[in-house]
Amino acid sequence: MPIKLIQVQRKLNVGINTVVEFLHRNGFSVEDNPNTRISDEQYALLVKEFGKDLPEKDRNFAADRMRKEVPSVKEEKTAEIKTVIPEEFRPKIVMKGHIDLDGGQHKKQQEEPKAKEEPKVKEEPKVKEEPKVKEAPAAPAAQAPVKPAQPAQAPTEKKEEKVIVVEVEKEKTVEKQPVVAEPKVESVKPEQEVEKTEEKDDNLFRLNSVKLESKIKVTGKIDLDALNQSTRPKKKTKEEKRKERDEKQKFNNNRPGNNSNGPGAPHKSPNSPTLIKPNAPAKPGEEGDAKKKRKRIKKDRVDVNNTPGTNYPRPNRDDRPNNDRKPRLKKPVKAEVSEEDVQKQIKETLARLTNKNNKNNKGAKYRRDKRDAAVKREHELMEQEELESKVLKLTEFVTANDLANMMDVSVTEVIGTCMSIGLMVSINQRLDAETINIVAEEFGYKTEYVSADVVEAINADEEDDNEEDWVARPPIVTVMGHVDHGKTSLLDNIRSANVIAGEAGGITQHIGAYNVKLQNGRRITFLDTPGHEAFTAMRARGAKVTDIAIIIVAADDNVMPQTIEAINHASAAGVPIVFAINKIDKPHANPEKIKEELANMNYLVEDWGGKYQSQEISAKKGIGVEELLEKVLLEADLLDLKANPKKRAVGSIIESSLDKGRGYVSTILVENGTLKMGDIVLAGTHQGRIKAMFNERNQRVEKAGPSEPVLILGLNGAPQAGDTFNVLETEQEAREIANRREQLQRELGLRTQKMLTLDDIGRRIAVGNFQELNVIVKGDVDGSVEALSDSLIRLSTEEIQVNVIHKAVGQISESDVVLAAASNAIIIGFQVRPSLQARRNAEKEGVEIRLYSIIYDAIEEVKSAMEGMLSPEIKEEITAYVEVQQVFKITKVGTVAGCMVKEGKIKRTNKIRLIRDGIVIYAGELGSLKRFKDDAKEVVAGLDCGLNITNFNDIQVGDMIEAYEETEIKKTL
């Protein structure tokens, strides 16, 4: 008979995996599952292998099982041999043949182990008892087949006799009176033996009895009738069924009596209202067992349906005949009423009420329609405003900061979005239309350009471009690099070879762009912008100002942050890069290290198998400069740069400033066309006729062709660096467009002004010590003003906000002082001075004017001023760990702890924390610190001390005390 792996594991005391592996080795495929059943043959193999610790009878039984299973085809012969033995003991059949097994099998199974413990000689007189008839054979049943093989001991023979008797009895009970039916007996007998072996297993596993029945039905095909006959007595019991029917009738008859006239029920219900309710109808019935079972089931059903905690009403509800109607009484779930339905209902009700009172219905209807129309118009207006709030009305060039204000988002988010699309922008950098569209769309806004007509007017004025007129133009090269890496030295070296000796230096330092003629007759325009900001701004607008970038790195230094930033700007703009490794004449120069650092940034130079050209140079000694210029020209040839010199000039503003003697001066770079004296130029919001032009050597020139930088006089203001300039036909047209742009810029300025909202006030309150620093920036050139404003705005923190309320080119005027006094601002002048009247007004109004020549000094001073406005930061430093080793209770003092300093040094003035099991129990101050009987200022590690804690006495042995100091640190930005 199959047996589960879990049972085999328990019997043999080995793991399931071991059993499965062993069976696999012996050619059996068994699933690794505790509930997998194995055959007797497999079980016998396992017993043979692992059953050394098993009792001898179990091992023999397993072997016998295997023997039995092998000749399973010859069942009849084995059965014939065994049926001969029991016939000697027929006298006992008469006593036990009439036994009917009761329905309560659980009791029998529970009593089995007890029966087996008793001496088996005493069981003969107690054969009549129902449970023990089955139990007595159960234990020795397994030995019946075993003993013929080894009949050695006397006590075992007695057991054999009993076993045989019971086997015969069972055969007889199955057959009832079959004298001739020997084949049935033969076939039943092996099954009975299987039954008994299974019963033996029941010593440990009670549930096997259920499996027993199911397996008997499955295994024996011929004996199903016999098995059904044997099991039938348990189910039939006609007398019990008849009695139950009678009791049901009696109970139903007595039911109404219990509610109305029953004297028993009312007496019992007050005594125990909940428990005796089911027992009340129990009196009329004589047999209580069957009745109790039925009522128990009913009681459970009542308890499930009824809510707990009710007292007397329960029996009445329980006894009602119409209990089935309860679910029908459930109320239907009401549908939720929407706000619109409510409003509609109210309107209809009001309309009915007003109609009753108003006899003149026409007038009321007219007024009602008028009201409805007004409400409808209001709704439409609100919807229109909501739509318009998502539309940004702006000019083509808007700074990142203004765009952020219009969309009511942080400027860092706008810059982050630009970086994600490959654009490096700064706070005050102006964005082109395409970039604005992408950024606005990212934040869910639509754009509407109010300056479209202005752009169209300029575009309409442009001339047609013929490809036949195109000629090669010199490349525009920007030199970029970290401070002190030799950028200026390289430019001076390149320029000194081509500049007349008497004209070196001078104004060329301010122009920032110049044209160099090489020995081979070719020209290169070098651009020396004040910072990489302007370069990026020009690239962002798509104006191809720079064609090639030279990145200078010092060989005795590293690739510095500003160098990395410059490389990123050039890469984002898609400009070819040539690396110049400078200062190779120095003793500590290591060009290979620079190449390695560039390779780590994924910029492989040609020496290392990459695509970027590099040249080792010494700018001071002129080593390698010619080779560098050759490589630059090679890159230019690959780009195939061309322009049309026959059309009107278009270009970019490099720098602008206010010169006291000459007025507003602008350095421009012509990209296409030719600029001539007397041309009408429009640049941003400024326009004017060119009065004079100077080249980088401060010599007057009459015209400037493509890729030529010149300094022009004649504009009515200082245009912003990076603005595009156009040459127009008439001055009137230029003035109209400039005025229109100025108007749009003012409107944009008003739109971007942000009033203080409740959210801002709440945020400031949350920060606590919020400060504002208003600044007015004046400088000599527009590039410096932009760079300084940008740097100051970047200093803003959560606690201090820097606002640049005004910035301009030129000296500090009286109007600047008035504005500063009104807005409580400070004036920062960069390489400019205040006028005499402005200085007097500033002293009178108490306005602070700070003047600087170096941009870094200005930034550092503003930074230190801001740091002075910050509240200091409190830093905590742990000074000692102390372990409590003893605790003393002292009256009027409290709990004193005897401690050992484990680490550091504890001072009398330290603040402390008491830590128990890693959790801070208390934080406070020391009440006293003593060493022996003397007060101590401090105790170092390894010494013991006594201490008590102010207002805390719950100190325990084993607690850790952590001593710490708080120091105020000046906050930095």
Swiss-Prot record:
Residue intervals of the tr-type G domain: 472-642
Compartments, record wording: Cytoplasm
Chain spans, region G2: 506-510
Region (Disordered): 97-343, 353-372
One CC-aspect GO term: cytoplasm
Binding site for GTP: 481-488, 528-532, 582-585
Biased composition (Low complexity): 136-155, 252-266
Name the record gives this protein: Translation initiation factor IF-2
Region named G4: 582-585
Keyword hit for Nucleotide-binding: yes
Compositional bias of kind Basic and acidic residues: 97-135, 156-175, 183-204, 212-224, 237-250, 315-326, 333-343
Region (G5): 618-620
Stretches the record annotates as G3: 528-531
Higher taxonomy: Bacteria, Pseudomonadati, Bacteroidota, Bacteroidia, Bacteroidales
InterPro entries assigned to the protein according to its UniProt record, in alphabetical order: EF-G-like_DII (IPR053905), EFTu-like_2 (IPR004161), IF2_II (IPR044145), IF2_N (IPR006847), P-loop_NTPase (IPR027417), Small_GTP-bd (IPR005225), T_Tr_GTP-bd_dom (IPR000795), TF_IF2_bacterial-like (IPR000178)
UniProt similarity note: Belongs to the TRAFAC class translation factor GTPase superfamily. Classic translation factor GTPase family. IF-2 subfamily.
Molecular function as annotated in GO: GTP binding; GTPase activity; translation initiation factor activity
Gene3D superfamilies: P-loop containing nucleotide triphosphate hydrolases (3.40.50.300), Translation factors (2.40.30.10), Translation initiation factor IF- 2, domain 3 (3.40.50.10050)
Keywords per UniProt: Cytoplasm, GTP-binding, Initiation factor, Nucleotide-binding, Protein biosynthesis
Keyword Nucleotide-binding found: yes
Natural source organism: Parabacteroides distasonis (strain ATCC 8503 / DSM 20701 / CIP 104284 / JCM 5825 / NCTC 11152)
Region (G1): 481-488
Protein's gene: infB
Role noted for this protein: One of the essential components for the initiation of protein synthesis. Protects formylmethionyl-tRNA from spontaneous hydrolysis and promotes its binding to the 30S ribosomal subunits. Also involved in the hydrolysis of GTP during the formation of the 70S ribosomal complex.
